[in-house]
């Protein structure tokens, strides 16, 4: 059962440590996983790890043509190696969030290393894009625990997980499979995770957007699906 609790929409989540590897989280904790169903918004989010530009240009062009804005979780490494695409993201008005610098499993790092991953990425984004990533971050691979969340929170970051995994990271992912999964399971309030390096997601995007439009749903940012003003990228 999906529910929203206040504006922050914080829910208890026991989930996988990565999209492809099930791992029981031994300790309950709260994080943002789902938005407000009454908003009529589905938040499409795109992660950029250490891969190249991938299909990012195609995704940005599709969104630009339709006047849509999403949230992109960017690693500092990706921004450093794709400065023109990174600057286009800001120029197009998208919400920018933090995905660490070099995409490590944060649960394996010391507190100081976690802080460095987040703070240095924010500095890179500021230097290259003229934007900031606070208050949102997404742990690489979805790997997080109570300590990671507490350390991130002390640095001004709130974890944004997802309620629907597109499956675009699978080795044999196809546009049909990605579109089919999203359209079968998506509901207003969902936070959907996709990846800028996925050709399958880029090719599926027009199909997904057309069907959302037919259903009367709107695509928006994390801030919008949470009923908040756009806090990140400022």
Each predicted region: which residue ranges?
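Short beta-strands and strand-loop turn motifs
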Residues: 43-45, 98-100, 160-166, 190-195
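Basic- and aromatic-lined ligand-binding clefts that recognize polyanionic substrates
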Residues: 127-144, 148-152
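Terminal accessory/targeting
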Residues: 1-45, 57-71, 187-234
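Active-site beta-loop-alpha junctions enriched in small/polar residues
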Residues: 49, 75-77, 101, 140-142, ...
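His/Asp/Glu-enriched short active-site or ligand-binding loop at hydrolase and phosphoryl-transfer sites
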Residues: 143-185, 217-228
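Non-membrane alpha-helical structural segments and their capping/turn regions in soluble enzymes
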Residues: 111-116, 176, 183, 199-202
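Alpha-helical scaffolding segments of alpha/beta enzyme cores, especially the outer helices
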Residues: 58-61, 84, 88, 116, ...
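Active-site beta->alpha N-cap acidic-glycine motif
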Residues: 24-109, 113, 117-128, 133-134, ...
